[in-house]
């Protein structure tokens, strides 16, 4: 029972990943609307930021799976 509670608590990071991706994409969109000519040059930074934010969610999901099935 305790490992399921721990796994549930570990998935809180998934919500943080969603908030992080939304924050990165929203700020990119706001900047692109202010200066459309600079938007294509910032596309790589957008993808790197989204990848870092999403990686934290994937790590928390893997920790939750490890807590449920390996411990």
Curated annotation (Swiss-Prot):
Where it sits in the cell: the answer is: Cell inner membrane
Principal cellular location given in the protein's record: membrane
Write the signal peptide boundaries.
Answer: none
For this protein, the record's SUPFAM superfamilies field holds:
F1F0 ATP synthase subunit C (SSF81333)
> What Gene Ontology molecular-function terms does this entry list?
lipid binding; proton-transporting ATP synthase activity, rotational mechanism
GO-annotated cellular components: plasma membrane; proton-transporting ATP synthase complex; proton-transporting two-sector ATPase complex, proton-transporting domain
Lipid bilayer topology: Multi-pass membrane protein
Q: Which Pfam families did the record assign?
A: ATP-synt_C
The organism's place on the tree of life at top rank: Bacteria
Site positions for Reversibly protonated during proton transport, renumbered to this chain? Answer: 54
Q: Which UniProt keywords apply?
A: ATP synthesis, Cell inner membrane, Cell membrane, CF(0), Hydrogen ion transport, Ion transport, Lipid-binding, Membrane, Plasmid, Transmembrane, Transmembrane helix, Transport
Q: Where are the transmembrane segments?
A: 4-24, 46-66
Q: How does it assemble?
A: F-type ATPases have 2 components, F(1) - the catalytic core - and F(0) - the membrane proton channel. F(1) has five subunits: alpha(3), beta(3), gamma(1), delta(1), epsilon(1). F(0) has four main subunits: a(1), b(1), b'(1) and c(10-14). The alpha and beta chains form an alternating ring which encloses part of the gamma chain. F(1) is attached to F(0) by a central stalk formed by the gamma and epsilon chains, while a peripheral stalk is formed by the delta, b and b' chains.
Family per similarity comment: Belongs to the ATPase C chain family.
NCBIfam families on file: PRK07558.1 (NF005733)
State the PANTHER family in the record. Answer: ATP SYNTHASE LIPID-BINDING PROTEIN, MITOCHONDRIAL, ATPASE PROTEIN 9
Job description of the protein: F(1)F(0) ATP synthase produces ATP from ADP in the presence of a proton or sodium gradient. F-type ATPases consist of two structural domains, F(1) containing the extramembraneous catalytic core and F(0) containing the membrane proton channel, linked together by a central stalk and a peripheral stalk. During catalysis, ATP synthesis in the catalytic domain of F(1) is coupled via a rotary mechanism of the central stalk subunits to proton translocation. Key component of the F(0) channel; it plays a direct role in translocation across the membrane. A homomeric c-ring of between 10-14 subunits forms the central stalk rotor element with the F(1) delta and epsilon subunits.
What name does UniProt use for this protein? ATP synthase subunit c 1
Organism expressing this protein natively: Cereibacter sphaeroides (strain ATCC 17029 / ATH 2.4.9)
